[in-house]
């Protein structure tokens, strides 16, 4: 077979093994983010403004209208926002018009003035601005109000002229521009910059608004119980359900199914009462629902109250009592409340998706499929289209749709005049049983042309009708996990919801101000306060579960983060309540949600990823493309279908056999229909998959030979590719799948040209393109820190003078090689054991990978320090730091900042900072220090920024943000950021993995000469344990090494797409062509002994990744560190400088060994025995025997908790004497024996040694005299009597007690 080469982008070529021709190109992979945000900016904001405005005051005399609005230019660029740790945002401004109407205003007449002047003076006094008369007629005068920037006019209509006054109507109109706050902008790659970090808003998968039916079994009587939930996006839930109750029919009592409704999860209300409350009388209800015994039994008797309430006002009040338990209301109040809950557009939101779902579920044509008509159906002109007795098959239903869309079968329904909504229902009668045509069912549907985004009375009737039909076996229950019933709330919709909440809060504030403010001095700018909107938006981006710190480890991680779907978050599921059904793979996920890629932990199945070709439609439902089949011929037309639409079609697989003309060759093919796999005739096929890879996500489709891997390992492989760290010399894989180019291009980390043009200039920092629109600049990143601390660096691919096309990659980003994704390295792998060093998935690697920097990565860490204004004065950045030797300051420049390029170690000073100290009474020791070191040590404290443990590296950059030039927090004078870059070679303890879930930790790095080598002398790079393959069933890695070796020998890179790639025969063929024998096994020779291994070993080229679980980040040591305040036990974890927890199971291990003394030591003086650990420390310092342990603090915590429960608890010694626990609490921590006597201290104190130990010389001669004064002060202690000493002790105790309290 001739090998065909295919170009991927403009630089990479691969031998392509794709079988399915006419594959659809992958769409823009981040359009789920960019397109919906564009919709929000262009349409979403306008929709919310239209909902809220105009705002009318409570009395109706003040109206605030929205004229227009706009986004202005952003306040700062993306790079400035990152550097300054600010938000990349733009201000929203709007033009508002305020109209104030004052009716029947009395204006007292003055003697000299005419009417226009009189009214002018009266208005000027109240408005506070000069006004000019513009125009006047007999009864109407027009004025212009001079009020600064705003346009303000006044119209006065004289209604009545009395002797002493005028009665006038005044209308004042003011127009002005109002600032509505700053709004975060999306960058071109689908992210937001919030506080300097890139964030992504993840799309949410939630239950769609609509009507959902289910049937349960009543275990008491074996009867079916029928339920329906009518769920809005926002507003009141309606739940109908059936119940088996005893009812009276005349004198006779019998059990019947009766129907109830719950309004917003309240107590049950009879459906009869509910319909009566809506103004539908019993006769009309029986006419609508037909001769149905369930409806009749529901109307017979309300078993809860004992009677049926046919009066509307009584029914409304009864329902009100059930909803608002314990409250009473007038009939008018109850009616207003009930109708407000259900039919008020502002309180109830069904959304476009909810209306779409209701029409889809409740429309008549979808419910009478395969039923026989019990009446004639006429079109709008009265012509009979279907006669009674017609079987409604697929063809008849398609014909009926058009007739119903035109308005046939509609009838009006009567209900309360106070409910303003559509009053049209569709009604068709069919026979319940096609064979025995005795009973007739009324199918009540809603108008297919309805557009209301709130529930209407016809919706309620059709919903209840469906439930009644379900009891007759007409209709079907809903599968809540079906993707037809779950929709995606994208970034645009999520932001629109937040914007609506903020604007509604502003509306509430405006209405309050309209009622309380001075009527005439009111203007748009002073009644709008934008803080509620800014607060809501800020809270969403900073605190929402859906606004996530972007995973920027590599391009694939970034891309996957943007395409993620979560069922968690506000309005979604919770981890604890989500069952197995909602987490499981569903047949409707095919082509829409990846069945492989999901987290392994408690979020499994709740966080998913979009499949490669999936799109979100305008209703929020996920669509996937299929190629249309017309008369057995597969066309090139692609239709995007939702899960609901797809179930009505027969869909065949992409890899069916086709002729050159695209005709299906086989008479029968495997296909899917209504969620089942079937064998279909070729004439029955409606659609064909566009590509075999449409079932999986981008990360999963990067795994070659995926079809040969177990699903669990494929899941790990997909997840671990996202953890691969960018290496300094990325290499794309020899064995790829063909999606590497699209993934890299759309990730946002490659620089892609937006224009056709010629490269005018190129260097490491920017590329300039000459285009028809002029010169276009593309700035390149060099050593920029990502969110995860990896290095973002762009490498140009174009040369000066080169022609480029729109969409061409101009520069590679991290983990990108010639425009293709390159997460790891191609290395020679042998599946063999070696002295037990690769036991349990451990990995042995060659020293070549270290010395040649094959797996070396660059990491950048940012350290920030602030210079603040304190109460004692401003902090200073300086080189002059008290008590610091010259050697410790050797890397600092004159300003006190570390010099760029310096190699620093933990503990080194990065920025010298001193903070002023408050003036207090100095102790003799402080006076001594002050005398030695002068004024500086007296006034300031060292608060310098130092390199933390594990933070060693080279200073890469320093950025300063002084208050004079940048926005900084209050009390901050300057912010300084230091960037330290680390070059990390691969080492023992680092985690590595392949693409098939084959992960392991490096256990040994062998010298090159010790590694086994092939007969031609080529040493292997990595040795993996062969036992890692059979039990894991990820055979793809074995096929990959054989194909990788063949590709390396041929010098060709290969593309083998998932489910559509190379078959075994082709693999054998290419291995033969590359000269590989023995099925890819090689004779290996031990590098140490020169002897051959007993058997040939599988050797080949595998693509290996270095993962972001490096031993450098995990290694941690602690001597004495922080302790927990309550339990006094050491903190845990590296971040808290804590220790390793010696937990319950570790205690069992020591108990099993009988190591009693070690165990006692660990549980007391090494942990929370406060007195004991103090004494032990003292003993170690003085080289004495370690004392006996005391009482652990956790024992005291336990006793206090028991005392808190009201128990009196005592401690009893061996003799039975009661000991006071409190005395143990208040005992001194240090034993009196350990206190040093003043005389001993005086004898041991040596001034000369003290000076030497400080590494400082006395600055002045007088300082030596101060030492003598201090020495003399120790003599004073000897001269004090016992009482005076006791007084001093008491004062010291009081000070210590105060310190403990504080």
Curated annotation (Swiss-Prot):
The keyword Transcription applies. HAMAP family: RNApol_bact_RpoB. This is DNA-directed RNA polymerase subunit beta. Keywords: DNA-directed RNA polymerase, Nucleotidyltransferase, Transcription, Transferase. GO terms for molecular function: DNA binding; DNA-directed RNA polymerase activity; ribonucleoside binding. The RNAP catalytic core consists of 2 alpha, 1 beta, 1 beta' and 1 omega subunit. When a sigma factor is associated with the core the holoenzyme is formed, which can initiate transcription. The gene is rpoB. Belongs to the RNA polymerase beta chain family. GO terms for cellular component: DNA-directed RNA polymerase complex. DNA-dependent RNA polymerase catalyzes the transcription of DNA into RNA using the four ribonucleoside triphosphates as substrates. InterPro entries: DNA-dir_RNA_pol_bsu_ext_1_sf, DNA-dir_RNA_pol_bsu_external_1, DNA-dir_RNA_pol_su2, DNA-dir_RNAP_su2_dom, DNA-dir_RNAP_su2_hyb_sf, RNA_pol_bsu_bac, RNA_pol_bsu_CS, RNA_pol_bsu_protrusion. Its EC number is 2.7.7.6. SUPFAM superfamilies: beta and beta-prime subunits of DNA dependent RNA-polymerase (SSF64484). It comes from Spiroplasma citri.
